[in-house]
């Protein structure tokens, strides 16, 4: 039963416990068969049981076990794209690491954890895979939020999400850059 591999990752993420080395080796070795024999709907049933605050660990475990690469290759490919960490320094990080960090911090302390919001954080930068351009020594990702919303819609349909959940997550992905635009004088006046 290859679904047990996903269940082991879920338990490890939810309870923040390490996976025994031989078990981990078996999960990695069987990762291609997990995707061959377990329907995406069954994988998503296990995924829905992951607590929102533990989802970043679950996604990282799925990536390390090479299951995410087959299930959601658009998200796994973000590990190949680099971006500047912030405008103040020249340190870089992968977009996938940035995504995991955002999931880990969503929402900040004092807010209620939201499973669909955390899923939106997983997909918020998926458009960077399709809009990335390297020019004058730096990466740009113009309109990645718009492209990402369309890509997210296709992914969520493939993963058998309900239409209401798809609409909500795509709305969050589409508008996740809104506050950056509103911080200008013109944006504040329009608001």
Task: Describe each model-derived feature in a short phrase.
Residues 183-186:
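Active-site-proximal binding-pocket segments
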């Amino acid at each position: 039963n290859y679904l047990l591999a996903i269940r082991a990752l879920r338990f490890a993420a939810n309870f923040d416990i390490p996976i025994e080395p031989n078990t981990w080796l078996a999960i990695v070795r069987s990762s291609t068969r997990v995707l061959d024999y377990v329907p995406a709907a069954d994988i998503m049933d296990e995924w829905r049981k992951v607590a929102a605050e533990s989802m970043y660990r679950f996604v990282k475990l799925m990536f390390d076990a090479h299951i995410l690469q087959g299930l959601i290759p658009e998200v796994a490919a973000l590990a190949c794209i680099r971006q500047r960490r912030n405008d103040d320094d020249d340190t870089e990080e992968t977009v996938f690491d940035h995504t995991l960090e955002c999931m880990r911090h969503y929402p900040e302390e004092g807010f209620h954890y939201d499973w669909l919001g955390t899923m939106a954080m997983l997909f918020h930068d998926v458009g960077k895979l399709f809009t990335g351009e390297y020019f004058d020594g730096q990466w740009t990702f113009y309109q990645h939020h718009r492209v990402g919303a369309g890509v997210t819609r296709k992914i969520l349909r493939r993963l058998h999400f309900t239409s209401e959940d798809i609409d909500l997550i795509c709305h969050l992905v589409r508008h996740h850059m809104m506050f950056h635009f509103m911080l200008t004088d013109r944006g504040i006046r329009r608001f």
